[in-house]
Amino acid sequence: MYKEPFQPTYEYALECDKHDELKDFQTEFYKKEGTIYLDGNSLGLLSKRAEKSLLTLLDSWKEYGIDGWTEGEHPWFFLSEKLGELTAPLIGALPEESIVTGSTTTNIHQVIATFYEPKGIRTKILADELTFPSDIYALQSQIRLKGLDPDEHLVRVKSRDGRTLSEDDIIQAMTDDIALILLPSVLYRSGQILDMKRLTAEAHERGIHIGFDLCHSIGSIPHHFKEWDVDFAIWCNYKYLNAGPGGVAGLYVNKKHFNRLPGLSGWFSSRKDKQFDMEHTLTAADHAGAYQIGTPHILSTAPLIGSLEIFKDAGIERLREKSLHITRYMLNLIDHELKDFGFAIGNPLEDEKRGGHIYLEHAEAARICKALKANGVIPDFRAPNGVRLAPVALYNTYEEVWQSVMILKKIMKDEEYKQFENKREVVA
């Protein structure tokens, strides 16, 4: 599929683009002329299909008013379940195990409220010190709601190098006092993929429920939840899945737990045929829809309709194949062109451990990111010293990767970054 072996030339980049089986999808996206967008791991670009589905849902409001809940091309009342079914193949789940609902953080609160049942000596939640802050805030909050002290009952696995986690260390931390585990599938800084299959098996061997935050993996790597028997998962849809800023998130619950009442119940937790009976006793849905809380945010959900059509056409296996190749290409090019400028590669080099973005460490990272933006390359800064670059399989080209590395080389060689302050903006 892709030209080998690596060559650091512009011509090689063009050859790779020529052989790219996914190249036709680039025209599906709005790409600003003169800009190389390498921040799809924070916010994916708008596609024409996502735009169309948003406008379609707006038109249904205009056309049907209240009847839009049951009329039109995409009736709102069933939309969350429909999109959950379309998302299920991306995580290797059954259609009824996936639901599009809430936000990442509200969904964390939901699954923790549902699965965290401290009793006896099992009172602690296991997480890690490198996870995204919102996960920790939610876990601390849920522990306090149980009348417990987060300082004592939230265990965070330490990193040996400040970048990655050892699965052996995580397993060693699965002690008899652990009631629940929440871990990232892919670390948001270093892009390390955790071995979800192994960790799930080890947790279950010890009688512990385990779930994963998929924000940096869904739409980028394949998942096999049915095979792995993961208990629950949550994710956002606005990164690799291109659902737009504030796009509605997703939630997975293993079907073996469908008899478990949601920790946070609401009107849309109800079975559809019972919802408008207006009873004060909840008859929960017999699928992942039970873990919805409130009325779905229809207009924030709409772009995902078109976006998931693209993923169905492209196929997650093909997307992963290109992602691995284009990130490997970028790593090779960085090593070839930037080795004299003080950069350290912070993400794993092994294919099976590397997610969809590159993580460079540099003491001047914040001002380097500003210089890149000034030169038309959109990166992502992560404190304290990280530059994240995400060549997304659906819409980035090898030519863009080559150009961005050459721009970065010029910035470093000419010390252009020194004209900027070495501190982050309000939104990094």
Swiss-Prot record:
The gene is kynU. Disulfide bonds: none annotated. GO terms for cellular component: cytoplasm. Catalyzes the cleavage of L-kynurenine (L-Kyn) and L-3-hydroxykynurenine (L-3OHKyn) into anthranilic acid (AA) and 3-hydroxyanthranilic acid (3-OHAA), respectively. It is an enzyme of class 3 (hydrolase). The modification N6-(pyridoxal phosphate)lysine is found at residue 239. It catalyses: L-kynurenine + H2O = anthranilate + L-alanine + H(+); 3-hydroxy-L-kynurenine + H2O = 3-hydroxyanthranilate + L-alanine + H(+). Keywords: Hydrolase, Pyridine nucleotide biosynthesis, Pyridoxal phosphate. Pathway: Amino-acid degradation; L-kynurenine degradation; L-alanine and anthranilate from L-kynurenine: step 1/1; Cofactor biosynthesis; NAD(+) biosynthesis; quinolinate from L-kynurenine: step 2/3. GO terms for molecular function: kynureninase activity; pyridoxal phosphate binding. This is Kynureninase. GO terms for biological process: anthranilate metabolic process; L-kynurenine catabolic process; L-tryptophan catabolic process to kynurenine; NAD biosynthetic process; quinolinate biosynthetic process. Its cofactor is pyridoxal 5'-phosphate. Gene3D superfamilies: Aspartate Aminotransferase, domain 1, Type I PLP-dependent aspartate aminotransferase-like (Major domain).
